[in-house]
A protein has these predicted regions:
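Poly-acidic low-complexity segments
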Residues: 16-18, 34, 106
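A short, well-ordered alpha-helical element
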Residues: 31-59
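Short, intrinsically disordered, charge-balanced linker/junction segments flanking boundaries
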Residues: 118-122
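Short, aliphatic-rich beta-strand segments
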Residues: 22-28
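Amphipathic alpha-helical interaction surfaces in cytosolic regulatory modules
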Residues: 37, 42, 59-116
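Short beta-strand/loop segment at the start of cytosolic alpha/beta domains
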Residues: 1-18
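Structural motif
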Residues: 28-30, 103-104
Length: 122
């Protein structure tokens, strides 16, 4: 299984799912015209990751780093779905660590991240 790398644009984030290190990183802006379509390759990759590395007990930990500078409402909805997938992965014995990074002067992004992660725990 190879890693997944999606190059960022002005409207979409760089996404790097590094299989060797079991890390998933989101960088910069996420305001794609169609968030569901943009994130579909990542959803498919996570499904395959679960089949190959999680169910075979190869992976014990996954670290997710959100390093957005901005994301829109459509992206937030997709992120809720993604976090739901990761919740299922934790139920299979994988420790999923989620880190939320934000610019020190951006309280809005801090609050949005806190809300997103709090909703996932519900």
């Amino acid at each position: 299984m190879n890693s997944l790398k999606i190059e960022g644009t002005t409207f979409t984030p760089e996404i790097n799912f590094d299989i060797e290190n079991n890390t998933l990183t989101f960088l910069k802006v996420s305001k794609p015209a169609n968030a569901i379509e943009f994130y579909k390759p990542l959803f498919d990759f996570i499904d395959n990751f679960e089949k190959v590395k999680v169910k075979s007990k190869i992976t014990k930990e996954l670290v997710i780093d959100f390093k957005f500078t901005y994301f829109n409402t459509a992206t937030a909805k997709v992120l809720y779905e993604l976090l739901g997938k990761f919740k299922k992965i934790t139920e299979q014995g994988v420790d999923v660590v989620v880190n939320w990074y934000y610019p020190s002067d951006d309280d809005d992004l801090l609050e949005e991240g806190a809300e997103l992660l709090e909703e996932d725990k519900a």
